[in-house]
């Protein structure tokens, strides 16, 4: 992921100035990485090593979303809606 793109995502989803570790920011960054890797795997179908990394990232994102859902349902709904993860 390009440094500028990552910084842009952080500024878009941060809760306050200097916030880089909130669940919203982490989920947004993971979503970008997942989408990028998904495009890579459409071209390189036999890249099993990257496929495993993709599954680990999806699991990490799922864990963060579960944490948000359990602790603050409004923030969970907001991030899901912003990123378009659920229908």
Swiss-Prot record:
GO molecular function: rRNA binding; structural constituent of ribosome
GO cellular component entries: cytosolic small ribosomal subunit
Nucleotide-binding is among the record's keywords: no
PROSITE patterns with a match to the protein in the record: RIBOSOMAL_S15
Alphabetical list of SUPFAM superfamilies matching this protein: S15/NS1 RNA-binding domain
Keywords carried by this UniProt record: Ribonucleoprotein, Ribosomal protein, RNA-binding, rRNA-binding
CDD domains: Ribosomal_S15p_S13e (cd00353)
UniProt xrefs under SMART domains: Ribosomal_S15
GO biological process, one term: translation
Record's keyword annotation contains Transcription: no
Subunit field text: Part of the 30S ribosomal subunit. Forms a bridge to the 50S subunit in the 70S ribosome, contacting the 23S rRNA.
Membership in a protein family: Belongs to the universal ribosomal protein uS15 family.
Function summary: One of the primary rRNA binding proteins, it binds directly to 16S rRNA where it helps nucleate assembly of the platform of the 30S subunit by binding and bridging several RNA helices of the 16S rRNA. Forms an intersubunit bridge (bridge B4) with the 23S rRNA of the 50S subunit in the ribosome.
Stated name of the protein: Small ribosomal subunit protein uS15
Organism lineage: Bacteria, Bacillati, Bacillota, Clostridia, Eubacteriales
Gene giving rise to this polypeptide: rpsO
């Amino acid at each position: 992921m390009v440094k500028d793109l990552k910084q842009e995502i952080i500024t878009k989803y941060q809760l306050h100035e200097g916030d880089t570790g909130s669940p919203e920011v982490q989920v947004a960054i993971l979503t970008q990485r997942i989408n990028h890797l998904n495009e890579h795997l459409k071209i390189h179908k036999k890249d099993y090593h990257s496929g495993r990394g993709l599954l680990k990232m999806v699991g990490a994102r799922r864990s963060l979303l579960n944490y948000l859902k359990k602790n603050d349902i409004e923030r969970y709904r907001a991030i899901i809606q912003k990123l378009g993860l659920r229908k």
